[in-house]
Regions:
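N-terminal intrinsically disordered, cationic/polar leader segments
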Residues: 1-96
Length: 96
């Protein structure tokens, strides 16, 4: 239970950062954030970002990229298998 609370707090911070980035991106036409799910509607397609508390991961999927999984590397950062942090990765997609 404690790990799910930790995940919920960290993922909420990440989702808030992603929403803030989406609001600044000229590529993002619309976005929505609702209870562990962020939807980004970009010119290149829709992106769905979902927190998976039971796995301790955040999943990003779209037709443009397929799917990417981000996990807690040291209990503080969500990274993909290449070691790239999720917010940095999203910045590239949003061209910020």
């Amino acid at each position: 239970m404690n790990s799910e609370i930790h995940f919920a707090k960290l993922s909420a911070v990440v989702f808030d950062e992603i929403v803030a980035l989406a609001g600044r991106s000229p590529l993002c036409d619309e976005y929505d954030c609702n209870e562990g799910v962020v939807e980004l509607f970009l010119r290149q397609g829709a992106f769905l970002i979902v927190g998976k508390a039971d796995l301790g991961e955040i999943w990003v999927s779209s037709l443009a990229i397929g799917a990417e999984r981000f996990y807690l590397d040291d209990g503080k950062r969500f990274v993909n298998k290449s070691g790239e942090e999720i917010v940095s990765w999203i910045k590239k997609i949003l061209q910020l």
